[in-house]
Structures are given as structure tokens and as C-alpha cells.
């Protein structure tokens, strides 16, 4: 097995869940094993993310084409990767990093490197005839993540008046992942009924959650809690709530402007203290803009010992930024998005650094997704403990949940559900 090499790499342009072009890479090994990987794309993008290479030709897919990236894979990356040992993932990923030669993948694109990196890992697992989570995580890969399920979409993920990007339910009281899915689906059904009864629109946003024009954030909380309780569940015991605020999207001139509010940092932190004491909110993602370092210090100091404070735009799956956060006591959890950094190895380095320093880790999808289920395997492989992959509608979201259901059955009695955060 150790002498099985990469024989061919083929990239092509496909479409993601929003109809935007993205990359699919196919790897063929010397023993004719084949594997494919597709990469996602974000709508709310952190300033410090690795660069996603687009064509920027306004006459072709409105500038969103990825033919440049596809050509780079086929003509530049492939010749330097072909012939390498399939099982040496770290060496392959380091070669991809070297080919790019920049700090942020700006030359060949993180979408190019990630597609190749993931396809090779999947091919390696396939040729060894073991699941991907076991190949990259070993015998300790057995923790099924608690899902943070986005039931109401707002912000840049929906065409409505809600400023906060995601309102999530967290089934922390389930005994296994299968139960978490059942409980959450029941709440999702009930939520739809309640929204209809209040004459709110039940169309869905990019990530599959409902996207109604609800007037206030507090009303959203009340409606979700009502759906949970009318489904026969109790707050905290069975479910808690989470928010992805995406505060950078409404931060300007050192002020946070959303709904009818205009807050400075101190006032915004007080607002969060109020809503987290009033409602069972146990996770806040990007509650502060990425460049507001003092704000991150303040909210971590004020709420970090009570709830989960998640950095997404703050860290962008980058070890240097995570290390800076650790040293300066910014946040207590890291959102992990492989396409923010560009290779499987760098993704795992970010996870390990966070976990080593007692930061929670949450593997995450993007708003523009495909049917690729690699993040489900990464969640289990790295024992991340939590996953964000959208709501309980749209098949590109359900594909990840269904893969986790399959993994739980495969692990059988070895499977452990992470549960409470």
C-alpha cells in the first residue's frame, strides 16, 4: 500500500448551492482508485481568509467563474503532485503551499489547493478501504458532534430584515446523534407551523433555515422557544440557543448599527449580557467585529466563563490568528472552515492548536455548499465536538447530517455523542 502513488488529477468547474461556480477535483491513483472532492464558498467572508481565486470576468458567470483555478490545478498543480505517495498527506499539502508561495494562497487560490488536498485524502482512505474519518483521525475518531442547527436565517444569508445571520437550536440533551436529529426535526416542523400561524413567510435562506421578516430579534427567540416547548422539550435540559451575529457586517465608524440600535462596543456587550440572561443562549459567534480587538477582550472577560464565544472572522482557521487570540484572551471557541485556509493539514493544525489550549472547536460549512460530506468526517476525525452545517432543509445541508448518521451506525457502540457544550 505504501507505494501507491497519485497518477492523475483532473479539475472541473461545477455549481454550488447558490448557482455559483466552484471546483471539483478528481484524483486517480496508480491502482486506479478514484475519489472526488468539491469546495464550498462563503457569502460572509472574513478579511483575513485565504484567497478564493475567481475569474473576475463580468461577462462570464458575473465574474464568479473559476476556470483560472481549474486550469491551475490541471496545468500547474497536477504535474508537481503526480507521482507522490498518496499516504503522505502532510508532504502533499506542504507541496501545495509551496507551489502557491504566498501567505494567503493569493496566487493559485485556496479553492484550488483545498479541492486537491481533500480529493487526495479521500482517495487514500478509499484505497485503504477504511472510512475517511478513520484514515485522518485514527482509532480515537469516535465523537459525534453536537449540531448547531440554523433554523432562522438573516443577515447576508437571507433576503429579509433580520441583521443577525443565524439563529440556531442546539440539541444538547440528546443521548446520541440520531436522537439529536430527530428532536431537531420535530422542532423544525413545529417552527414552520408557528410561523405560518403568525402569517410569516416560510421560504428558506441560503442555509435552509426559514427567512421570515420578523420585526425583532427578541421575537425570533420567543418563537423558537415556543416551537421547542410545543414539541415537548425543555430549554437547557433538551435544547439551548445559539447565534451567529456576524457583527462585522454592521460595524462602521466604530459603531454597531442594527435594527433600531446604534451601539458602541461597551453598549453592545451589555446588550449581549441582557439577551443571554433573558434567553437560553449558550453560544455567540462573531458577536464583535474582527478588527475590534478591545471588544473581543471585553466580551470574553464579561461572558467567556458563562457561554461559548466563537471566533470565525476573528480566526479564519489560521494558526497565527488563533495563537494571537489565545495569548490575548480573545474568545473561547474557534470555528473551523477548511476553505478559509486551503489544505487538510492546515485545517487540522488549527483544530489541534485550539484544542490544546482548551478552546472549543466547531467544524463548519459555508453558505455556498455542495453535496461533498468531507466536513462530517473531519468533525469525527478531530473529535471537534460541534458542527454547523445549516438547517433541516436543502439537500446539500442534509447530506452532511446524513453522513454523520451513517458514521454513528458504523461506529456502533464505540460512538460517543458530544452533547452539552
Swiss-Prot record:
Entry superkingdom: Bacteria
Catalytic residues (UniProt): 207 (proton donor), 337 (proton acceptor)
EC number(s) from the headed UniProt entry: 4.2.1.11
Matches recorded under Pfam families: Enolase_C, Enolase_N
Cofactor notes: Binds a second Mg(2+) ion via substrate during catalysis.
SMART domains: Enolase_C, Enolase_N
Catalysis: reaction(s): (2R)-2-phosphoglycerate = phosphoenolpyruvate + H2O
Top EC category: lyase
A GO MF term: phosphopyruvate hydratase activity
Chain sites annotated for binding (2R)-2-phosphoglycerate: 165, 337, 366-367, 388
Biological process terms in GO annotation: glycolytic process
Any one GO cellular component localisation term in the record: cell surface
Primary location group: cytoplasm
Positions annotated to bind Mg(2+): 244, 285, 312
Pathway: Carbohydrate degradation; glycolysis; pyruvate from D-glyceraldehyde 3-phosphate: step 4/5
Cofactor: Mg(2+)
InterPro entries registered for this protein in UniProt: Enolase (IPR000941), Enolase-like_C_sf (IPR036849), Enolase-like_N (IPR029017), Enolase_C (IPR020810), Enolase_CS (IPR020809), Enolase_N (IPR020811)
NCBIfam families with a match to the protein in the record: eno (TIGR01060)
Described purpose of this protein according to its UniProt entry: Catalyzes the reversible conversion of 2-phosphoglycerate (2-PG) into phosphoenolpyruvate (PEP). It is essential for the degradation of carbohydrates via glycolysis.
Protein's name in the database: Enolase
Amino acid at each position: 500500500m505504501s507505494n501507491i502513488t497519485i497518477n492523475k488529477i483532473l479539475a472541473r468547474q461545477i455549481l454550488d448551492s447558490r448557482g455559483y461556480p466552484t471546483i471539483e477535483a478528481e484524483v486517480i491513483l496508480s491502482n486506479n482508485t478514484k475519489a472526488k472532492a468539491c469546495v464550498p464558498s462563503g457569502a460572509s467572508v472574513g478579511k483575513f481568509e485565504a484567497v478564493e481565486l475567481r475569474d473576475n470576468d463580468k461577462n462570464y458567470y458575473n465574474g464568479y467563474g473559476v476556470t483560472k483555478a481549474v486550469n491551475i490545478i490541471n496545468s500547474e498543480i497536477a504535474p508537481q503532485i503526480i507521482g507522490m505517495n498518496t499516504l503522505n498527506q502532510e508532504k502533499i499539502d506542504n507541496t501545495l503551499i509551496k507551489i502557491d508561495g504566498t501567505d494567503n494562497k493569493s496566487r493559485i487560490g485556496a479553492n484550488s489547493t483545498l479541492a486537491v488536498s481533500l480529493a487526495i485524502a479521500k482517495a487514500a482512505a478509499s484505497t485503504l478501504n477504511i472510512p475517511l474519518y478513520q484514515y485522518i483521525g485514527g482509532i480515537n475518531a469516535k465523537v459525534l458532534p453536537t449540531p448547531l442547527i440554523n433554523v432562522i436565517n438573516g443577515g447576508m444569508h437571507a433576503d429579509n430584515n433580520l441583521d443577525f445571520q443565524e439563529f440556531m437550536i442546539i440539541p444538547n440533551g440528546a443521548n446520541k446523534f440520531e436522537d439529536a436529529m430527530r428532536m431537531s426535526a420535530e422542532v423544525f416542523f413545529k417552527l414552520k407551523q408557528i410561523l405560518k400561524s403568525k402569517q410569516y413567510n416560510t421560504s428558506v435562506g441560503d442555509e435552509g433555515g426559514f427567512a421570515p421578516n420578523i420585526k425583532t430579534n427578541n421575537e425570533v427567540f420567543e418563537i423558537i422557544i415556543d416551537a421547542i416547548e410545543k414539541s415537548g422539550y425543555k430549554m437547557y435540559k433538551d435544547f439551548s440557543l445559539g447565534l451567529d451575529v456576524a457583527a462585522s457586517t454592521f460595524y462602521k465608524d466604530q459603531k454597531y448599527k442594527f435594527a433600531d440600535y446604534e451601539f458602541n462596543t461597551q453598549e453592545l456587550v451589555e446588550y449581549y449580557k441582557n439577551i443571554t440572561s433573558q434567553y437560553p443562549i449558550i453560544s455567540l459567534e462573531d458577536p464583535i467585529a474582527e478588527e475590534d480587538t478591545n471588544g473581543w477582550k471585553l466580551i470574553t472577560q464579561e461572558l467567556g466563563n458563562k457561554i461559548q464565544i466563537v471566533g470565525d472572522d476573528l480566526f479564519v482557521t489560521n494558526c497565527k490568528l488563533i495563537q494571537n487570540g489565545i495569548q490575548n484572551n480573545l474568545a473561547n471557541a474557534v470555528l473551523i472552515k477548511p476553505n478559509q485556509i486551503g489544505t487538510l493539514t492546515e485545517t487540522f493544525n488549527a483544530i489541534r492548536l485550539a484544542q490544546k489550549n482548551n478552546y472549543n472547536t466547531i467544524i463548519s460549512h459555508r453558505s455556498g455548499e455542495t453535496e461533498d460530506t468531507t466536513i462530517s468526517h473531519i468533525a469525527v476525525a478531530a473529535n471537534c465536538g460541534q458542527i454547523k452545517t445549516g438547517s433541516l432543509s436543502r439537500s446539500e445541508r442534509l447530506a452532511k447530517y446524513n453522513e454523520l448518521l451513517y458514521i454513528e451506525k458504523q461506529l456502533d457502540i464505540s460512538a460517543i455523542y458530544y452533547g452539552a457544550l
